[in-house]
Amino acid sequence: MNDVVLSCKNVSKKYTEFKTDIAILKDVNLEIKKGEKVAILGLSGSGKTTLLNVLGGLDKCSAGEVYLMGERFDNQSVNKRAKMRNKHLGFIYQLHHLLPEFTAIENVMIPLAITKKYTKKESIKLANEILKKVGLDHRADHKPAELSGGERQRVAIARALVTNPNCILADEPTGNLDSQRSESIFALMQQLSDDFGTSFVIVTHDEKLASRMNKIYRLVDGELELVINSN
């Protein structure tokens, strides 16, 4: 049985500025298996976010192939990519991107509304369950301004997980948090990965936190290198 959730083969990405090609990614190969926790390290501007966007179908590669759940992903139409993304992927960002006028539970319910598969009653139940998993069911009716930074990020994690995706792509999810809250968020993501069997790909600059992952890669000058494989 093929347990590869997300992969890319010989992926390159370049931009053209003033008639000059600038290579961001160079022949990147990566394979994410079910339940794996993978960290990608790199300096600012090394292409980490670009790689995450290409893997998530938010940006197109200049060359190479991306596969999601065994199906070619990068060459699909915009609508097909969106459907595949909504079904199989969740996203967490450095900035929580919660809607300020919505409560925690309403923010978590947004992905469920996009799928159009659940009644409001079902959505409330699912959102409450995942908020309980991240320890915030008692804050369900609070708006983002009434939550701490760590609590907002927990809501963002709940929102990413509520549709039970196969893989979470997280871009510097603890970048705006202090070390204690960062440790707590990383521990939570590890626990949720174990509980749900969800794969996590986490872009971070924090080597200490990255050391918690099964695999650690480093992106240097657009090339991805495997640093540690503890599987």
Swiss-Prot record:
Gene3D superfamilies: P-loop containing nucleotide triphosphate hydrolases. GO terms for molecular function: ATP binding; ATP hydrolysis activity; transmembrane transporter activity. Keywords: ATP-binding, Cell inner membrane, Cell membrane, Membrane, Nucleotide-binding, Translocase, Transport. It is found in: Cell inner membrane. ATP binds at residues 42-49. Its EC number is 7.6.2.-. Residues 6-230 form the ABC transporter domain. GO terms for cellular component: plasma membrane. Its main location: membrane. Belongs to the ABC transporter superfamily. Lipoprotein translocase (TC 3.A.1.125) family. The complex is composed of two ATP-binding proteins (LolD) and two transmembrane proteins (LolC and LolE). This is Lipoprotein-releasing system ATP-binding protein LolD. It comes from Francisella tularensis subsp. holarctica (strain LVS).
